[in-house]
Amino acid sequence: MKTIYDIIIRPVLTEKAVKDNEKKNTLTFEVDMNASKTEIKEAVEKIFNVKVKEVRTLIVKPKPKRFGFRSSGYKKAWKKAIVKVESEKPINIAELV
């Protein structure tokens, strides 16, 4: 059985994710590939003590990666969840990490 900390792997702290956090009141996470939207919603509500409005998920495709001059491969695919919360002021993820 997956715990809430197995579902949410890490927050995504890109420039776009931080801007959306401030303006649209959303949180962005890397989540387990097999996690459903309801599992993600319950995990975020328990960890951050907030009410979740909606959860959007997407699969980030693998990108090519080089290992030195000759060998190359791919980074693995991962699942991203964008969670919209109902709190009045935005949650600062950078302080919590």
From Swiss-Prot:
Asked if the Swiss-Prot or TrEMBL record annotates the protein with the keyword rRNA-binding, the reply is: yes
What one GO molecular function would you report for this record?
A: rRNA binding
Q: Which domain of life is it from?
A: Bacteria
Q: Which InterPro entries match?
A: Nucleotide-bd_a/b_plait_sf (IPR012677), Ribosomal_uL23-like (IPR013025), Ribosomal_uL23/eL15/eS24_sf (IPR012678)
What are its GO biological-process terms?
A: translation
Which keywords appear in this protein's UniProt record, sorted alphabetically?
Ribonucleoprotein, Ribosomal protein, RNA-binding, rRNA-binding
Question: Which SUPFAM superfamilies does its entry note?
Answer: Ribosomal proteins S24e, L23 and L15e
Q: What Gene Ontology cellular-component terms does the record carry? A: ribonucleoprotein complex; ribosome
Q: How does it assemble?
A: Part of the 50S ribosomal subunit. Contacts protein L29, and trigger factor when it is bound to the ribosome.
Q: Which family does it belong to?
A: Belongs to the universal ribosomal protein uL23 family.
Function, in words: One of the early assembly proteins it binds 23S rRNA. One of the proteins that surrounds the polypeptide exit tunnel on the outside of the ribosome. Forms the main docking site for trigger factor binding to the ribosome.
Q: What is this protein called?
A: Large ribosomal subunit protein uL23
Q: Lineage of this protein's species?
A: Bacteria, Pseudomonadati, Aquificota, Aquificia, Aquificales
